[in-house]
Curated annotation (Swiss-Prot):
Assembly, per entry: Part of the 50S ribosomal subunit.
SUPFAM superfamilies in the cross-refs: Ribosomal protein L22
Species annotation: Acaryochloris marina (strain MBIC 11017)
Its biological purpose: This protein binds specifically to 23S rRNA; its binding is stimulated by other ribosomal proteins, e.g. L4, L17, and L20. It is important during the early stages of 50S assembly. It makes multiple contacts with different domains of the 23S rRNA in the assembled 50S subunit and ribosome.
Pfam families: Ribosomal_L22
Protein name as it appears in the record: Large ribosomal subunit protein uL22
Length: 120
């Protein structure tokens, strides 16, 4: 998908190794995909999920990349691609009764957001 992102008329940003479940991040990304930059900002500001903070940070970075590298106006930008891939799992151990230990897996994810100029 990365080669496809480089071909779009816009910019993208990534955040890697975010200590959050990709499933929970996708719930937020599904709400902003296809929306304009301003709408996406408003939606992310008022959603009650913990995943909104890193998604908002990546979205702002993608828009800054579009402004700086491509010279695009933020008013015309639309979230064209937004997805979360699974990252490596952090493995931890929790002590249990009678000297045993259970393995706890803490998920991570990689967030990618691409913005492109609106076709109007």
């Amino acid at each position: 998908m990365t080669t496809q992102l480089k071909d779009i008329n816009g910019a993208y940003a990534k955040a890697k190794y975010i200590r959050m479940s990709p499933r929970k991040v996708r719930r937020v990304l599904d709400q902003i995909r296809g929306r304009s930059y301003r709408e996406a900002l408003i939606v992310l500001e008022f959603m009650p999920y913990r995943a909104c903070e890193p998604v908002l940070k990546v979205l702002r970075s993608a828009v800054a990349n579009a402004e700086t590298n491509r010279g695009l106006d933020p008013v015309d930008l639309v979230v064209s691609h937004a997805y979360a891939d699974q990252g490596p799992r952090l493995k931890r151990f929790r002590p249990r009764a009678q000297g045993r230990a259970y393995q706890i897996q803490k998920p991570t994810c990689h967030i990618t957001i691409a913005v492109s100029a609106e076709a109007s």
